[in-house]
């Protein structure tokens, strides 16, 4: 802190006086510093006690600690509670005290003015204030006490640094007060340590008791909840187990019922077979007995047996035809699923075609017409003029040649289209079209009769072209055609895409020839498979 010129002169004069006589002349400024220091200490103590009293009213534990360990704290708390509980008494005492203080103040003002005048005239012997700091072990003390001791040491150091000159009597009293304060603070520190230790022990026991109580309560609640959850889980498990067992029992009963029905059906079938055998045996015995006498009846039986065999043959043909149609439908559906599956890059349907060919030949044998227009062969008719002596009829009808069916024609076309060749999926066709982008751009720049130089030039300039995407307008330039084809392939519109590519001419058409062949093969196979499906459904 910088000092003025006047203060420097006073300090110099004070130093010279102390050197010569050992005493210093008290100045008005030195007494003013001491008064400020005194008021600072008083205000700090007042604030400390006031804060402790106010916080003690809010926290009972701190109030006990404050009244037991801080000097004069208990009396101040009792006084505060006395006037706080009886506010009218406080007003009466405050009024009486105010009147007494006003009288004392008036008398003090007159006396103080006289004493000040006498002090100015008299020169007292004073000493430089030098206080010892508070050396108290605060390693395990309360943090607030540490803060108080630190603040007091800072205050003592500031007083020592200010070089205050005070009278000898006041110097001795201050030294004594410092020693008393050191003793009281040491006692307070020990008391605080002991109280803190007792408080920690008591609080620890309370916390342990509280924790034990909470543990017991939580334990009982947990056991209750656990028991409730276990009972609920047992009920749910019991219910689920009951449902599962009922379901298993129902399934077993159903299986046993089906088994009994199957056994019953087998028994009925076996019984019918046995009855037929017995019937045949009886018929055979009767025929053997009456063979010689009843040939007419034997011929009637023979004709009925022939009719029965024809009916059986027709039934077997119908069943075989239906089975052949079912197998044809299954094979056609298999081919359709394979050619429409995008997970397969290419498909070979030679095996399916051979099966279709075999089933078609089998079906054509069932669809053969008789040699006569009425559906029956003349050899099967009775009373015919061509009947011989042995009862046999020679058929003179010319065999009819049936025209090839649509099914066989479609199969032949499908075999010629796909024999030894693979059918690409829509995704594979789209990918191959994307691979033609660079060659397509190069071909779009080539003249009709281009040489090697034209090829190289078109290849170089094609690197600077951009490929169009999306669905542009119906323009005829190569980029628009390429974009429309890509968009049609993206939505699996292969027919329109092939029409766009086929309409190209010159080098672009030549570049796309292999792609056109694969796409046309895919379209032809799809159309032929659709024709086969429709024809089989009509049969």
From Swiss-Prot:
The keyword Transmembrane applies. Its main location: mitochondrion. Residues 57-539 are mitochondrial intermembrane. One of its GO terms (cellular component) is MICOS complex. The chain crosses the membrane at residues 37-56. Keywords: Coiled coil, Membrane, Mitochondrion, Mitochondrion inner membrane, Transit peptide, Transmembrane, Transmembrane helix. It is a single-pass membrane protein. The keyword Transport does not apply. Residues 172-264 form a coiled coil. GO terms for biological process: cristae formation. Residues 1-16 form a transit peptide. Pfam families: Mitofilin. It is found in: Mitochondrion inner membrane. Residues 17-36 are mitochondrial matrix. Component of the mitochondrial contact site and cristae organizing system (MICOS) complex. Belongs to the MICOS complex subunit Mic60 family. Component of the MICOS complex, a large protein complex of the mitochondrial inner membrane that plays crucial roles in the maintenance of crista junctions, inner membrane architecture, and formation of contact sites to the outer membrane. Plays a role in keeping cristae membranes connected to the inner boundary membrane. Also promotes protein import via the mitochondrial intermembrane space assembly (MIA) pathway. This is MICOS complex subunit MIC60. It comes from Saccharomyces cerevisiae (strain Lalvin EC1118 / Prise de mousse) (Baker's yeast).
């Amino acid at each position: 802190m910088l000092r003025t010129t006047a203060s420097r002169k006073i300090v110099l004069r004070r130093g010279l006086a102390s050197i010569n006589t050992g005493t210093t002349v008290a100045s008005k400024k030195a007494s003013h510093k001491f008064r400020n220091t005194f008021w600072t200490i008083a205000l700090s103590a007042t604030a400390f006690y006031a804060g402790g009293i106010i916080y003690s009213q809010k926290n009972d534990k701190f109030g006990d600690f404050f009244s037991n360990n801080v000097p004069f704290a208990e009396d101040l708390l009792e006084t505060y509670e006395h006037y706080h509980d009886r506010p009218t008494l406080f007003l009466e005492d405050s009024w009486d005290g105010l009147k007494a203080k006003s009288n004392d103040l008036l008398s003090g003002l007159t006396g103080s003015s006289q004493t000040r005048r006498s002090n100015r005239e008299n020169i007292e012997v004073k000493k430089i204030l030098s206080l010892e700091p508070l050396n108290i072990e605060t390693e395990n003390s309360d943090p607030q006490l540490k803060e108080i001791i630190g603040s007091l040491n800072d205050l003592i150091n500031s007083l020592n640094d200010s070089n205050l000159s005070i009278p000898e009597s006041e110097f001795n009293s201050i030294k004594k007060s410092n020693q008393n304060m050191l003793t009281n603070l040491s006692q307070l520190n020990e008391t605080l340590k002991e109280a803190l230790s007792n408080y920690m022990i008591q609080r620890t026991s309370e916390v342990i008791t509280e924790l034990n109580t909470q543990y017991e309560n939580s334990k009982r609640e947990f056991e209750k909840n656990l028991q409730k959850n276990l009972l609920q889980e047992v009920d749910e498990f019991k219910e689920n187990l009951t449902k599962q067992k009922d379901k298993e029992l129902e399934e077993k009963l159903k299986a046993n019922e089906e088994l009994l029905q199957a056994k019953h059906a087998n028994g009925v079938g076996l019984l019918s077979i046995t009855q037929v055998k017995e019937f045949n045996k009886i018929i055979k015995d009767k025929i053997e007995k009456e063979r010689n006498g009843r040939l007419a009846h034997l011929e009637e039986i023979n004709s009925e047996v022939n009719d029965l065999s024809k009916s059986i043959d027709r039934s077997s043909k119908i069943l075989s035809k239906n089975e052949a149609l079912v197998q044809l439908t299954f094979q056609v559906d298999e081919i359709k699923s394979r050619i429409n599956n995008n997970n397969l890059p290419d498909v070979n349907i030679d095996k399916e075609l051979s099966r279709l060919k075999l089933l078609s030949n089998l079906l054509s044998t069932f669809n053969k017409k008789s040699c006569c227009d009425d559906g029956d062969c003349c050899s099967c008719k009775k009373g015919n003029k061509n009947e011989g002596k042995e009862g046999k009829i020679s058929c003179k009808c010319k065999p009819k040649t049936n025209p090839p069916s649509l099914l066989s024609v479609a199969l032949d076309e499908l075999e010629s289209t796909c024999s030894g060749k693979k059918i690409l999926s829509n995704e594979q066709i789209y990918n191959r079209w994307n691979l033609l982008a660079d060659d397509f751009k190069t071909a779009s720049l080539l003249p009709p009769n281009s040489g090697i130089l034209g090829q190289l030039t078109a290849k170089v300039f094609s690197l600077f072209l951009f490929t169009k995407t999306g669905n542009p307008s119906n323009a005829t330039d190569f980029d628009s055609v390429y974009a429309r084809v890509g968009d049609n392939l993206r939505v699996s519109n292969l027919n329109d895409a092939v029409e766009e590519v086929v309409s190209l001419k010159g080098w672009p058409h030549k570049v796309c020839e292999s792609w056109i062949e694969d796409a046309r093969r895919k379209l032809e196979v799809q159309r032929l498979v659709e024709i086969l499906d429709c024809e089989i459904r009509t049969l």
